[in-house]
Curated annotation (Swiss-Prot):
<keyword id="KW-0173">Coenzyme A biosynthesis</keyword>
<feature type="binding site">
    <location>
        <position position="111"/>
    </location>
    <ligand>
        <name>3-methyl-2-oxobutanoate</name>
    </ligand>
</feature>
<dbReference type="InterPro" id="IPR003700">
    <property type="entry name" value="Pantoate_hydroxy_MeTrfase"/>
</dbReference>
<dbReference type="GO" id="GO:0015937">
    <property type="term" value="P:coenzyme A biosynthetic process"/>
</dbReference>
<dbReference type="InterPro" id="IPR015813">
    <property type="entry name" value="Pyrv/PenolPyrv_kinase-like_dom"/>
</dbReference>
<dbReference type="GO" id="GO:0000287">
    <property type="term" value="F:magnesium ion binding"/>
</dbReference>
<keyword id="KW-0808">Transferase</keyword>
<feature type="binding site">
    <location>
        <begin position="43"/>
        <end position="44"/>
    </location>
    <ligand>
        <name>3-methyl-2-oxobutanoate</name>
    </ligand>
</feature>
<feature type="binding site">
    <location>
        <position position="82"/>
    </location>
    <ligand>
        <name>3-methyl-2-oxobutanoate</name>
    </ligand>
</feature>
<keyword id="KW-0479">Metal-binding</keyword>
<dbReference type="InterPro" id="IPR040442">
    <property type="entry name" value="Pyrv_kinase-like_dom_sf"/>
</dbReference>
<feature type="binding site">
    <location>
        <position position="82"/>
    </location>
    <ligand>
        <name>Mg(2+)</name>
    </ligand>
</feature>
<comment type="similarity">
    <text>Belongs to the PanB family.</text>
</comment>
<protein>
    <recommendedName>
        <fullName>3-methyl-2-oxobutanoate hydroxymethyltransferase</fullName>
        <ecNumber>2.1.2.11</ecNumber>
    </recommendedName>
</protein>
<dbReference type="GO" id="GO:0003864">
    <property type="term" value="F:3-methyl-2-oxobutanoate hydroxymethyltransferase activity"/>
</dbReference>
<comment type="subunit">
    <text>Homodecamer; pentamer of dimers.</text>
</comment>
<comment type="pathway">
    <text>Cofactor biosynthesis; coenzyme A biosynthesis.</text>
</comment>
């Protein structure tokens, strides 16, 4: 068995690093066995697990419970937990208290959305011994302010801000940086400008790694984003299996003798 991943294993030039989300014990165990480098317990669970319209309704308690489940499953991959909406925006003290709860739940690091405006919080967490992954570009927790899940970085002003954000988070001590839904050329420029690994989602091939939502790639999402590739249709497999189970119970085929004792 390979050694467990550590934050210090994620260095520039050693990728590409493969990340995927997971939210529970069985899927975390499966993706770890498949060889991913990192598992993100994302607040995307609000949409793909809890059926919410966005990530804003995800609570810290939700994140703690799902982080605990994932952490129990994996012997190898690095586990990063999202800090949910309003768990860090109120200041360094709240951020430190809430991030520490996710670390105690089993996360190896936390991820928070936002740019230079949160550099002070990132620095506070890092100084306290909590590794931080940054997240710039499309920030789903700002979906109301953005007016939807829209690409960021099309204008020169946005491009400059993304570069400034990346450098500020790097300087604050972030060990890695997620870049979401920006033009590939902008992601490439950011990747070349910082000496920490960048992990793309919907931002092209020029980053130091890629991350996707598990439910999107295995076919459990009804309308996955355009940047996600579907590698399987697990929904059809589940539906077929349950239909067969329903039919066998209705027709008296299950349980058969091998499934019970007199």
């Amino acid at each position: 068995m390979s050694a467990r991943r550590r934050v210090t294993d994620f260095v520039k030039g050693k990728g590409p690093y493969v990340w995927v989300t997971a939210y529970d014990y069985p899927t975390a165990k499966i993706v770890d066995e498949a060889g991913v480098d990192g598992i993100l317990v994302g607040d995307s669970l609000g949409m793909v697990v809890l059926g919410l319209p966005n990530t804003l309704g995800v609570t810290l308690a939700d994140m703690i419970r799902h982080t605990q489940a994932v952490a129990r499953a994996r012997p190898r991959a690095l586990v990063v937990a999202d800090m949910p909406f309003m768990s860090y925006e109120t200041g360094p003290r709240d951020a430190l208290r809430n991030a520490s709860k996710l670390i105690k739940a089993g996360a190896d690091a936390v991820k928070l959305e936002g740019g230079a405006e949160y550099a002070r919080i990132v620095e506070k967490l890092v100084k306290a011994g909590i590794p931080v992954m940054g997240h710039i570009g499309l920030n789903p927790q700002r979906v109301l302010a953005l007016g939807g899940f829209k690409m960021v970085g099309r204008t020169e002003e946005q491009r400059r801000k993304l570069l400034d954000d990346a450098k500020a988070l790097r300087d604050a001590g972030a060990f890695s940086l997620v870049i979401e839904f920006v033009p590939a050329s902008v992601a490439k420029e950011i990747t070349e400008a910082v000496d920490i690994p960048t992990i793309c989602i919907g931002a092209g091939p020029h980053c130091d790694g890629q991350i996707l939502v598990l439910h999107d790639i295995i076919g459990l999402t009804e309308r996955p984003p355009s940047f996600a590739k579907r590698y399987a249709n697990v929904a059809d497999v589940i539906r077929s299996a349950v239909k067969q189970y329903v039919n066998e119970v209705k027709t008296g085929q299950f349980p058969s003798k091998e499934h019970f004792k007199e």
